[in-house]
Amino acid sequence: MPHLLHVDSSLATESSTSRSIATIFAEAWREAHPDGIITYRDLSVTPPPHLDWATVSARFTPPEQLSAEQAEAVKKGEELIAEVEAADEYLLSVPMYNYAVPSTFKAWIDQIIVMGRTVRQAPDDSALTGKKVTVVTAQGGSYGPGTPKEGWDHQQPYVAHILAALGATDIEFIRVEMTLAPVNPALAEFIDLFQRSKAEAAAAARLRASV
């Protein structure tokens, strides 16, 4: 049966744009796959541990030679890796923080990337090979061509490259821009742009979830 892994990373709850669009996707996915499974992980509630040397060194040590510290470190990330390996579709909700991704999302990525396991030399044999990935992003401003901060987006390019390293090729980004417009008077002229962007993202999420 279809199995969706839904990962949220916004620190906000009710006011989060990325969460709201991801919820629309998840609800539409449930309607399209009534017998499907959704595994949900909220990185703001249960932040993954940042990498330490015990974890890194353990990945290059035979299991029977692991120290107690290494074994404990590996155990912390094993649940996250198992969730990725069990799913066949992914919904990642990733707001932009300081022009990049939340630190909890980066920590999650660092935990699930394991050379020789989730990332393999053969491009068609990694954890996300042949699987569908939808990434919902929310950005306080706009960073496209011709904007004052063109080139400042270190969020989407990073996520795209990481997913490619994990073997994903069926990737769609659903982005909402100018999320700060309703709360920052200096950006008030862009409220209509934000509302239009959010409506388009909601429609894109419903469509993507249903196919």
From Swiss-Prot:
Keywords: Flavoprotein, FMN, NAD, Oxidoreductase. It is an enzyme of class 1 (oxidoreductase). The keyword Flavoprotein applies. The keyword Flavoprotein applies. Binds 1 FMN per subunit. One of its GO terms (molecular function) is FMN binding. FMN binds at S10, S16, T17, S18. InterPro entries: Flavodoxin_fold, Flavoprotein-like_sf, FMN-dep_NADH:Q_OxRdtase_AzoR1, NADH:quinone_OxRdtase_FMN_depd. It catalyses: 2 a quinone + NADH + H(+) = 2 a 1,4-benzosemiquinone + NAD(+); N,N-dimethyl-1,4-phenylenediamine + anthranilate + 2 NAD(+) = 2-(4-dimethylaminophenyl)diazenylbenzoate + 2 NADH + 2 H(+). Its cofactor is FMN. It holds the Pfam family Flavodoxin_2. Its EC number is 1.6.5.-, 1.7.1.17. Homodimer. Quinone reductase that provides resistance to thiol-specific stress caused by electrophilic quinones. Also exhibits azoreductase activity. Catalyzes the reductive cleavage of the azo bond in aromatic azo compounds to the corresponding amines. Belongs to the azoreductase type 1 family. HAMAP family: Azoreductase_type1 (MF_01216). This is FMN-dependent NADH:quinone oxidoreductase. It comes from Frankia casuarinae (strain DSM 45818 / CECT 9043 / HFP020203 / CcI3).
